[in-house]
């Protein structure tokens, strides 16, 4: 498997670069910024917490803009993963033969770079959101079981402790663990495939935690905004 993967990377790198670029550009379409400009002609990054995400839109702009933001963030990452799979399989059909393990590389790569685009959007001065909904959308395509359990963890922690950020952090930590459990113990995938998936989801989890460092500091101090707060 390792030898095949190395050969795949050597032979198919142009399509992988194209996939990463397309996903990044798609991810750079930050829904919170776009929706807020359309609804109130303002920049969401100048309101509330300053984060370009659905939670801040809900607190600062209301339910309808937050709904559009949520749909946009979920939709773009789902589209990116779908496009990534098509690009890698379509442009390298003679090499991959439609093998799912190679298509999986394209999908994960697209999801990762879509998240990076959301965090550091090219069109908006590289100041974006935290990538929680974008990650959820990606995982709904890659493994809906993992996505739904992570969503349940997010919801439970959020409701118990009244902090969206804590729910996001806990869901991020859970992501690579569940990926390994389902990939190996439930689906019986090869060790190499499972390790690749764990590596990718671990990278995403670390990105999510990194973006939540200010929240973690406020949680420790007891000053983090809670559900229902306008701050």
Q: What do the PLM-derived regions correspond to, one by one?
A:
Residues 1-14:
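Short, strongly hydrophobic alpha-helical membrane anchors
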Residues 58-62, 84-88, 113, 131-161, ...:
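Interfacial segments of multi-pass membrane proteins
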Residues 22-28, 33, 115-125, 157-165:
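Transmembrane alpha-helix interface/packing and boundary motifs in multi-pass membrane proteins
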């Amino acid at each position: 498997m390792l030898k095949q993967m190395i050969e795949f990377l050597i032979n198919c790198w142009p399509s992988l670069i194209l996939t990463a670029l397309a996903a990044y550009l798609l991810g750079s379409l930050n829904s919170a910024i776009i929706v807020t400009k359309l609804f109130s002609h303002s920049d969401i990054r100048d309101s509330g917490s300053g984060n370009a995400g659905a939670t801040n839109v809900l607190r600062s702009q209301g339910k309808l803009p937050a709904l559009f933001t949520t749909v946009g963030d979920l939709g773009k990452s789902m589209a990116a993963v779908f496009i990534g799979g098509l690009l890698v399989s379509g442009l390298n059909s003679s090499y991959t033969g439609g093998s799912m393990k190679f298509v999986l590389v394209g999908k994960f790569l697209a999801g990762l770079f879509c998240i990076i685009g959301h965090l550091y959007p090219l069109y908006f001065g590289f100041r974006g959101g935290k990538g929680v909904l974008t990650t959820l959308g990606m995982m709904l395509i890659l493994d809906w079981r993992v996505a739904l359990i992570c969503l349940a963890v997010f919801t439970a922690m959020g409701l118990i402790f009244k902090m969206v950020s804590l729910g996001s952090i806990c869901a991020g930590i859970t992501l690579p663990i569940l990926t390994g459990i389902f990939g190996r113990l439930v689906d019986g995938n090869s060790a190499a495939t499972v390790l690749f998936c764990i590596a990718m989801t671990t990278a995403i989890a670390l990105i999510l935690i990194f973006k939540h460092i200010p929240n973690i500091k406020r949680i420790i101090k007891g000053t983090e905004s809670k559900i229902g707060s306008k701050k």
